[in-house]
Each structure stands twice: as structure tokens, then as C-alpha cells.
Amino acid sequence: MKQIIPYGKCYIDSHDINEVKKSLKNSYLTSGPFVKKLENNIKKKLKVKYAVSCNSGTAALHLAFISIGLKKKDIVILPVINFVAASNILKMMDIKIIYSDVDINTGQITPAAIEECIKKNTLKKIKAIVTMPLGGFPENIEQFYKIKKKYNCFLIEDACHALGARYRF
């Protein structure tokens, strides 16, 4: 059976509503036990050592860009189809953006397109590549890791659309 999952439609059940009620009745405005529980659940699910929650994907991207030490005039490759937050933050930081073409079927950046961007900018070192699993469909992240290693740059996966999604099962 083929099931269509509508883009942008949320599924909220009674459990979700009850958790929000508990959070609102809690005396913490920020941080607190619910945030710690979320971060611990994400660490467990993704099998990572650290997880820091943010109030938005935009804030998370900003933290990621700061954490890799981006400086003015550094170069970052972004997919041409992307949420505007990444571009806005990089522009605010005075970072040069190279927009990469995307696959016509998936709307996602491809390893071949990244290689093409890098070849066109041979005199400049690429500081980071940002991928985005558009619509919740994870890309072949292993190929991007190979490119990251080959060019000694950072790889940031903007997983707002696909947190917890897996490429291989």
C-alpha cells in the first residue's frame, strides 16, 4: 500500500498534548527537566555523546557554524534548495556561500555537485559543506563523509527535516 505523507502537516496525539501540558505546568521557563530529557533521548536515539537543544533550527545552525570556527570570508557550500536560515546566518557572519545544484528527483545536494563546486573554486579552500535531507529523506551521508575527508573540511547535516531518519536500516 502506498501512503502519501503530506509535507508540513503535523501529527499530534493525546500523548503529545499531555506532555505539553506537563511542561506548561512546570515552573521552568527554559532548560529544566524536559529539556534534559529531550537531550538525553536524542543522544540515545542517535548514539552520540553530546546533544544540545535549541529553540529553532536557525539557532542550531548558527551554533554549528560558530562551533566550527567560521571566520569572515570563509567559504561554505549550500544546496540551492534549502531553508533560508542557513543563507541568512552565513550572510550575517560575512561568509562566502557557494550554492550547489541539487538532484532533479530528490531536491537534495549530491556528492557529484559538491565535487563540481569545489573544482570550480580550486584557488579557494572550502571550509564547510551543509547538506539537508529535504522532506525527511536522508541522503547517502557516507559519500559526503568521503568528500569531507578528501578536502579536509567540515560537514554539517541540517537535519531539521529528518532528525533520526536513517539512510541504512
Model regions and ranges:
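Phosphate-binding glycine-rich loop
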Residues: 28, 32-75, 89-93, 99-101
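Conserved PLP-anchoring active-site segment centered on the Schiff-base-forming lysine
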Residues: 64-124
